[in-house]
Amino acid sequence: KVTNIIVHRTVDKVIEKELDIDNLYIINRDNNKNINMIDFNAVEVNKLLSKVINNIQNNFQNIEKGDLSKINIEELGLENYDKKNLKKGIIYRIPLGIIFNNTLLSNFGPTIPIKINLNGNISGSISTKVTNYGINNALLEISINLEINQLVMLPITTEKLSFKTSIPVAMKLIQGIVPSYYFNGIDKN
């Protein structure tokens, strides 16, 4: 839950501060201002991805260390968490029965502190999608795909958890010339 909040809030903040949608697309036009070609600006898109990943890593490292002076708790959506506990890192307390995978005892027993550590593995990619949108129009979409691996450290064992998400970054509707004649291929025999 905390990972989801931190990732989405971090992406929102980077997009809000760094993104200029018009720089993500390269549109070539002819002399009549008609669109010849649309391409994605790989340099700008990769800069955006790099900033997102670096900011997520920095936020996780600062939270793990308990260094709250370098993060904005409200910006990351962590204002409801106990700040005293956040200074120790991300720690949850779960009943002992859950650790032994026993459903009957899952809510009983003493609670055990569990510290969540980032495994140091955040990978990201950019996906693009072009969809037909009416007659001679196209909808261009750019999304950031992230995969984050974490270790949950229990007193008895450690478990690796994976978190994947795809976040839309930009959408742009490109309008082409509407033809004088359009045949949509429907054959009514």
Cite the ranges covered by each PLM segment:
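Domain-level marker for long, solvent-exposed, non-transmembrane regions
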Residues: K1-N189
